[in-house]
Design a protein with these regions (language model features):
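Carbohydrate-recognition loop of C-type lectin domains
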Residues: 1-64
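Surface-exposed interaction regions enriched in Ser/Thr/Asp/Glu
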Residues: 166-270
Length: 270
């Protein structure tokens, strides 16, 4: 399709200028939002959830996103959630960034994955980034990409690891020094690697999804990155505010949500 468009554009091009069609590079946002509500002000949890979902989808489709140079405004997003229904008392929301990397199967290839935003380092012990599963030459199990920061907290190295299942917290590192990571510039570089298959196939393309936590929750679609909010990959949970609802005036059994639920407790991207 791209070549056909280029041929058509040549008919109208100024002499000496060759039109170039660039593939879109998407930077996806995934949010995890715990939304508290007063049960006395809403007939059901489903009503609150439906209204929130609708408002977030409208924001995801708006012109504030879906373009180069777009900025996800964290405080505005929180307000959209809070204002969705009068019963909502607050929300705790964390943000993650994702790139979908097309894999060149059965060939030795290097991959540079730019996010255009600084990465947050939650653990100096590693596992700050997450990936979906894939297979590489020489290893019979699914592998995932992990990172370990250097002491300067500016860059680090990449490794491959395996898990018995995606929910496991007991990784086995099977190959070290397979690439490097620049936390400041938000760039992940995989050394030449032979990828044989990927767990995820999107629109007929073998894809590795790579997820990182931004240093700032205001995420920018920098330069050639087209910013989108992936509602389908986000998680919205509506929770009873037991204090506001009068069920627990002393707050002794109040459900507290972490503001740092970056990876949803997982080492990998399911």
């Amino acid at each position: 399709i791209k070549e056909n468009i280029k041929r058509d554009l040549k008919k109208y091009a100024v002499a000496g200028i060759v039109p170039e069609i660039l593939d879109l590079k998407y930077l996806y946002l995934e949010v995890t939002s715990n939304i508290y509500y007063n049960t006395n002000q809403a007939p059901s949890v489903s009503e609150v959830a439906t209204v929130v979902q609708s408002n977030i989808e409208s924001y995801a489709d708006s012109s504030e996103l879906n373009k180069y140079g777009a900025r996800f405004k964290y405080s505005k997003f929180l307000k959209i959630v809070d204002d969705s229904h009068e019963a909502i008392t607050s929300n705790i929301t964390s943000v993650a960034m994702r790139r979908d990397v097309r894999a060149a199967l059965n060939t030795l290839a290097e991959y540079q994955i730019g996010f255009g935003n600084q990465f947050h380092i939650a653990r100096m012990s590693g596992y700050n980034i997450r990936s979906s599963a894939f297979r590489v030459a020489g290893i019979t199990q699914n592998v995932y990409i992990g990172d370990i920061p250097n002491t300067n907290r500016e860059n680090g190295s990449l490794f491959l690891f395996t898990l018995d299942n995606p929910a496991s917290r007991n990784p086995t590192i099977v190959r070290r020094n397979v690439g490097r990571i620049d936390y400041i510039k938000g760039i992940i570089t995989l050394n030449p690697i032979n990828i044989q298959s990927t767990q995820k196939v999107i629109d007929g393309q073998s894809v590795i999804q790579v997820v990182a936590t931004p240093q700032s929750n205001d995420v920018i679609g920098l330069q050639d990155l087209y910013l989108q909010l992936d509602v389908n990959s986000s998680v919205f949970e509506v929770i009873t505010d037991s204090i506001a609802s009068g069920l627990d005036p002393s707050a002794s059994s109040y459900t507290v949500s972490s503001s740092y639920n970056y990876n949803r407790g997982l080492l990998v991207k399911p």
